[in-house]
């Protein structure tokens, strides 16, 4: 049985959730499947050999039972097989690139690094004959990249989604509790750990923009420039706008939208009627609605914010 040596880069909310999944669900992870995911190629076992972080002492104190795993040192090429990159900054792009250049496969959840690389990381993986996967970077638990990639923009005419579970939680709370202000709802989401260290990434619509950019790339093979995507965050919504929406039996959602027929891309708060498939997607859930040339409208939904 083949044994794969894993290195985790980053140990924030997502990193901790991945570590827990790898350790508690070990018996359910059987092996490696082929590219079409319909055949088990190899039975494997794995070891987490190190967790690379910036502040070793912080994590060793908080997670003393695995203190030996934390390090600031990059592992030598001979000591690992797969890099799992889970940092939340653009610096993750350098980690991905170095691992690929060292002949390692990479799994990443870093939408910022992937989007800002504008396809360079995918090209680097191809150049070195390595695998780069990042399904977890977009739409939480929804396997949307696997669905969009083989279809392309020729068959997908319109894509609309709630791609940021944090802002969806905030908006849901505003419509649940009439006493809650926009500012209070943002503070509540931050306390629950739903928001990025810089909340502007979420409430300003940047996080959803990066994710939409990745989806557009999967459909078209090209990353749109940030200036090509209209962006308006939920931080522009007022308490009065929320009250007016409630009185009209409508709701606001931060919707990421790609219209492949017109080439218009945007991330904006949209006022939705109850007939909209995204209307009832509440809490920290994500959802994506695809309008397909032959299949019509298809909506997928799953957990979003947090680990």
PLM region descriptions:
Residues 5-22, 307:
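Glycine-rich adenosine-cofactor-binding loop
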Residues 25-62:
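NAD(P)-binding Rossmann-fold cofactor-contacting core
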Residues 72-102, 112-118:
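Beta-loop-alpha module in the N-terminal Rossmann-like domain of NAD(P)-dependent dehydrogenases
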Residues 92-94, 98, 111-150:
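Rossmann-fold NAD(P)-binding glycine/threonine-rich loop
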Residues 106-107:
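A short hydrophobic/small-residue beta-strand
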Residues 148-211, 215:
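Conserved anion/nucleotide-ligand pocket segment
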Residues 185-280, 285-287:
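Substrate-binding/catalytic subdomain of NAD(P)-dependent oxidoreductase enzymes
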Residues 276-307:
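ATP-dependent carboxylate/acyl-activation modules
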